[in-house]
């Protein structure tokens, strides 16, 4: 997760689907993997449940058909494999990310060019307001068109990062550490500094501690 640190060290990388509540629409940030295999005791070890997409939605009395909007941090396959199930959703993606998805470079195998063929895609070009209280922040580097998602909550702003990171990328003192996986290191560095310097609760996209939270805030 961290550039030039802990290379070769095995870590678990949780994959999250975030549900945004409070408005009149059912909104997701990312849709995760469709199929995955994890050790039986992993959730117990870290204090959270590991659920498949439909099962997780059902915990909130939702089905894929109930989803109105999906906001994508980026389009690596582990963030968008369940999109096609959400037949009524508009899918918000950065223009540069969509362009790369359609013509990916061989160096990055995590893009499936046809993965959004059956969904209603809305292109976003840079920072934008998606809904009242929900904005996207253009944060490229980990991917060409990554976007972090800023949400106004009852306890202030929360930001879901648009790039691969965990808590170790955000030390309490000093600059943030660039994501260890990136297509453009300098863009990745600048993006993570921008997010760290914002007055917000930062939710690192692959941090294990988030899985034990029932809601934020």
Task: Label each region the model flagged.
Residues 1-55, 148-163:
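Conserved beta-strand hairpin/beta-sheet module of binuclear metal-dependent hydrolase folds
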Residues 24, 87-90, 199:
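Residue-level detector of structured alpha->beta connecting loops
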Residues 34-37, 48-51, 55-62, 66-78, 93-138, 144-215, ...:
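Metallo-beta-lactamase
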Residues 40-43, 105, 214-216:
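Short, solvent-exposed loop/turn segments at secondary-structure boundaries
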Residues 84-87, 116:
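Short, conserved loop/helix-junction motifs that constitute active-site signature segments
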Residues 90-95, 160-162:
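Short hydrophobic/aromatic-enriched beta-strand-loop microsegments
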């Amino acid at each position: 997760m961290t550039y030039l640190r802990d290379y070769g060290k095995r870590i678990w990388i949780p994959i999250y689907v975030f549900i945004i509540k409070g408005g009149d629409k059912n909104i997701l940030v990312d849709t995760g993997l469709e199929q995955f295999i994890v050790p039986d005791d992993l959730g117990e070890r870290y204090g959270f449940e590991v659920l498949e997409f439909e099962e997780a939605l059902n915990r909130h009395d939702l089905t894929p058909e109930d989803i109105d909007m999906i906001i994508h941090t980026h389009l690596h396959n582990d963030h968008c494999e369940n999109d096609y199930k959400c037949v009524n959703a508009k899918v918000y993606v950065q223009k540069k990310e969509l362009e790369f998805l359609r013509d990916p470079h061989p160096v990055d195998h995590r893009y499936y060019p046809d993965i959004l063929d059956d969904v209603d895609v809305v292109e976003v070009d840079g920072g934008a307001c998606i809904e009242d209280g929900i904005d996207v922040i253009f944060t490229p580097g980990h991917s060409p068109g990554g976007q972090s998602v800023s949400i106004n909550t009852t306890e202030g702003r929360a930001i879901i990062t648009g790039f691969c990171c965990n808590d170790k990328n955000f030390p309490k003192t000093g600059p943030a550490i660039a994501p260890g996986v990136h297509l453009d290191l300098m863009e990745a560095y600048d993006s993570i500094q921008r997010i760290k310097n914002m007055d917000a609760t930062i939710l690192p996209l692959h941090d294990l501690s988030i899985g034990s939270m029932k809601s934020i805030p």
